[in-house]
Regions:
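Short, internal strand/loop/helix patches
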Residues: 120-163
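Structural microenvironment flanking redox-active thiols in thiol-disulfide oxidoreductases
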Residues: 84-125, 137-143
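Thiol-/selenol-based redox modules, centered on thioredoxin-like
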Residues: 153-203
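Bacterial signal peptide processing site
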Residues: 21-23
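Bacterial N-terminal signal peptides that target proteins for export
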Residues: 1-7
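A short beta-strand-turn-helix
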Residues: 43-70, 94
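C-terminal motif of bacterial Sec signal peptides marking the signal peptidase cleavage site
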Residues: 16-19
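Aromatic-flanked redox-active Cys/Sec active sites in thiol-based oxidoreductases
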Residues: 72-79, 107
Length: 203
């Protein structure tokens, strides 16, 4: 009986850390004709109607007219790790609003803004900027192409950019800095905070 409980706990922890997988490899290949060009501006509208514009840089994205660190969080409302970390991301955003902005991109589901608001934002206190747009898929494809990520995409999946460049991040499983350009699965705000401080000090 003890071994069964241990296995169940192990599987639950593994799923929380590894994220929700769509069971499809990232085979999307952006061509020159459909990829973003340097200087392109993408205006996003949040699920509550606020606006944010990101600008395509040579190798990434940045917030228009802002030098804030940008985190892009690819997630789904149904994803348990996404739900679990949402209130912590909200708290981190509130505490660091002067230097940091998170943009959440809904992925792998076709839902309307009201559904996201009622079933994610209100339930999990996720009132940071969430875009539920047809443009999301193209932005995500561009991100994965930028960082040469060719594996199956699991969510939550995050990248962090400063001055339009993807930043090296800690491994969120053990906290060591390994040079990944992404967080895969649930990540603690302690790790995010350490990485943000490091990025600010380096820049």
């Amino acid at each position: 009986m003890k071994s069964i409980k241990f296995i169940a706990l192990f599987l639950a922890a593994f799923l929380a850390l590894s994220g929700c997988n769509d069971n499809k490899s990232n085979t999307t290949q952006l061509t020159q004709s459909n990829s973003y060009k340097t200087g392109d501006e993408i205006e996003l509208t949040s699920i509550i109607g606020s606006k944010a514009t990101i600008v395509r840089t040579e190798n990434g994205f940045k917030l228009k007219d802002s030098d804030k660190i940008l985190m892009i969080d690819i997630f789904g409302t149904y994803c348990a790790p996404c739900q679990k970390e949402a209130p912590h991301l909200m708290d981190f955003q509130l505490k660091n609003a002067d230097k940091f902005m998170i943009i959440g991109l809904i992925h792998f589901e076709d839902v309307n803004d009201e559904y996201v608001l009622e079933n994610f934002s209100k339930k999990y206190n996720a009132y940071y900027f969430i875009a539920n747009s047809k443009e999301n898929s193209k932005i995500i494809d561009q991100i994965l192409n930028d960082i040469n990520y060719n594996r199956a995409l699991s969510i939550p999946f995050k990248v962090v950019l400063k001055n339009g460049k993807y930043q090296s991040l800690s491994d969120n499983l053990d906290g060591t800095v390994v040079g990944n350009k992404f967080y895969l699965g649930e990540v603690s705000t302690n790790i995010i905070s350490q990485d943000i401080d490091k990025i600010l000090n380096e820049n």
